[in-house]
Every structure is written in C-alpha cells, then in structure tokens.
C-alpha cells in the first residue's frame, strides 16, 4: 500500500479543490435523475430556480470541501474511507446542479472559492477533534442540507420536474449519508457549534442566490 507524503497530500488537496471549483471539471457517475422529464419555465420562474440551484451547487461545493478536509485529518482508516466515499457520491450532486444551471442559462456562484476554503478548514478541524466529532459534523451538515433541499422543493414551480427530480435524489442521498455517519459512531455536536454552522449556512444561502 502506498504511503502518501505531505507533498502528495497537498497536491491531492489542490486537485480536489480544482475539481470542485472549476465548472465542467466534475462528471457524474450516476445518471442524472432529470434526464427523463421536461420542464418549460417562464423568465421569472427560470431566474428563481437558477438562484435556488446556485445555492444548492454552493452547498455541494461546501460538502466536497468538508469531506476533503475531514479525510485529510481523520484518524481511523475506516472513517477516512467513509469521508472519501461520501465525497465521491456528492460529486454527482455537484455535476447535476451545474447541468441544471447551464440549462437555465445561468452560472455557479462567484463566491464558491470562499465557501470551499472555509468548509475545508472546518472539516479538517473536525477531523482533528476526533472521529466521533468528525462523523457528528457530517451528520449535522447533512441534516441542515436536507432541510434546505426540502425548503427548495417547496419553492419550485409545479412544472419544474427537472429540478425536482434532482433535488429529491440529492435529499435521499444526504439522509443516507447522515444515517451512515451516525451508525459509524457520530455524536451530537455542542449547541454552539450547530448555531455557528447554521449562521454560516444562512450567509451562504442568501449570497449565493444572487452571486
């Protein structure tokens, strides 16, 4: 088994960041859930949906960064593998959201590099704190992401089945990741940590909708 040096890990981290931040750099491994449905939207509806999907894309950028940061500092090999596998599955979400934004003639958030950097640091710190807290961080993150997705599903125009199919599959995956993290030994995070996570999430949501 190959031993990765600090330089190897640094190069890998840089590669992961580029794949998460550069449009078109990530390809989905699973079929896009929206491929079998159509959606015709008016100008205002399309603009609103683009804002929602931009927020969801930024959320997936954050998820990638969290998992990458946690995988870097996780102590147990099985936990590290869990983080790496979750990141791979989240890549599908990243690609699906980006595809939908292209269909809507819109763009990903200009603030994504900031969200990636913040989330990567938070993930690495969670890993340093210990695997049970790292897994707890995953569980809480996925819980909050699921709440956002459910809210966005309620905001979608009734005729937008393409976005709906994508968000429904994403929500199913997020809940599965949360369950897996808890089953692996994740613990509930301190209240102050959860409040901080919520505040950062709200800031990301409000800004990425427009930028």
Curated annotation (Swiss-Prot):
The keyword tRNA processing does not apply. Keywords: Cell membrane, Iron, Membrane, Metal-binding, Monooxygenase, Oxidoreductase, Ubiquinone biosynthesis. Its EC number is 1.14.99.60. Pathway: Cofactor biosynthesis; ubiquinone biosynthesis. Its cofactor is Fe cation. One of its GO terms (cellular component) is plasma membrane. It holds the Pfam family COQ7. Coiled coil: none annotated. Binds 2 iron ions per subunit. Its main location: membrane. It is found in: Cell membrane. Fe cation 1 binds at residues 60, 90, 93, 174. GO terms for molecular function: 3-demethoxyubiquinol 3-hydroxylase activity; metal ion binding. One of its GO terms (biological process) is ubiquinone biosynthetic process. It catalyses: a 5-methoxy-2-methyl-3-(all-trans-polyprenyl)benzene-1,4-diol + AH2 + O2 = a 3-demethylubiquinol + A + H2O. It is a peripheral membrane protein. Fe cation 2 binds at residues 90, 142, 174, 177. It comes from the Bacteria. The keyword Mitochondrion does not apply. NCBIfam families: DMQ_monoox_COQ7. Belongs to the COQ7 family. Catalyzes the hydroxylation of 2-nonaprenyl-3-methyl-6-methoxy-1,4-benzoquinol during ubiquinone biosynthesis. PANTHER family: 5-DEMETHOXYUBIQUINONE HYDROXYLASE, MITOCHONDRIAL, COENZYME Q10 BIOSYNTHESIS PROTEIN 7. This is 3-demethoxyubiquinol 3-hydroxylase. It comes from Acinetobacter baumannii (strain ATCC 17978 / DSM 105126 / CIP 53.77 / LMG 1025 / NCDC KC755 / 5377).
């Amino acid at each position: 088994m190959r031993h990765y040096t600090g330089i190897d890990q640094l190069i890998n981290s840089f590669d992961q960041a580029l794949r998460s931040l550069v449009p078109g750099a990530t390809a989905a491994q699973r079929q896009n859930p929206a491929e079998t449905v159509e959606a015709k939207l008016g100008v205002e509806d399309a603009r609103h949906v683009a804002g929602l999907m931009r927020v969801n894309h930024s959320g997936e950028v954050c998820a990638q960064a969290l998992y990458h940061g946690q995988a870097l500092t996780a102590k147990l090999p099985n936990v590290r593998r869990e983080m790496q596998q979750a990141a791979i599955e989240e890549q599908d979400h990243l690609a699906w959201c980006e595809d939908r934004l292209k269909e809507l003639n819109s763009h990903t958030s200009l603030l994504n590099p900031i969200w990636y950097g913040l989330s990567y640091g938070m993930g690495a710190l969670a890993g340093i704190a210990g695997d049970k807290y790292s897994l707890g961080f995953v569980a809480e993150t996925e819980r909050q992401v699921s709440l956002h997705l459910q809210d966005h599903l309620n905001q979608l125009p009734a005729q937008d089945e393409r976005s709906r199919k994508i968000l429904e599959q994403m929500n199913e995956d997020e809940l599965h990741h949360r369950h897996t993290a808890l089953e692996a030994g994740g613990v509930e995070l301190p209240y102050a940590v959860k409040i901080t996570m919520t505040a950062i999430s709200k800031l990301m949501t409000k800004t990425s909708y427009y930028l």
